[in-house]
Amino acid sequence: MQAMFSRIFFFVLFLTSTIAASFSLKPSRAVTADKREIERGRYLVEEVAKCTECHTPRGAQGQLEHEAWLQGAPIWIMPVRPIANWADRAPALAGLPSLTEQEAERVLAEGIGPEGETLRPPMHIYHMNHEDAHAIVAYLKSLPKAVH
């Protein structure tokens, strides 16, 4: 009787442990959603808005320096005609070092900086919707901050 009780006890213990382990191995929906949002932000930054073209430094051959991804860079393009407020440097975006999430979303949605100023050329005003702006901010926050 005691041997049977021991077997049942260990079987129940094994079953409970197996079930508990299977639940702990599955990522939560929130984590999965966060990963999807970050990936969507990466896609928008790298493939749609092309932020890396100005906000990532270039090497001697003109290639993007991946070790300094989105960490700010001198602007390499110049206007055909002089523009008084043309920016000479694109700020670091990796880790959002100089903007809050709300400020960054406002920049992307309205083209308005943290002090209420309009963005300087060559920065585009994207008029992004909230979901796109939020995804971009999630991606930028996921990157390590610039080390200048």
Language model region names:
Residues 52-53, 120-125, 148:
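Surface-exposed patches in mature extracellular/periplasmic domains of secreted proteins
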Residues 1-33:
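N-terminal export/targeting leaders of redox proteins
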Residues 41, 48-58, 136, 140:
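The canonical Cys-X-X-Cys-His
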Residues 25-47, 61-63:
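Electrostatic cytochrome c docking/interface patches
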Residues 49, 70-106, 124-134:
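Electron-transfer interface patches adjacent to heme c in soluble/periplasmic c-type cytochromes
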Residues 26, 36, 55, 101, ...:
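Ligand-binding pocket scaffold of soluble enzyme catalytic domains
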Residues 63-70:
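Short cysteine/histidine-rich zinc-coordinating motifs and their immediately flanking basic loops
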Residues 110-114:
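Glycine-rich, acidic and aromatic/proline-enriched surface loops and short helix-turn segments
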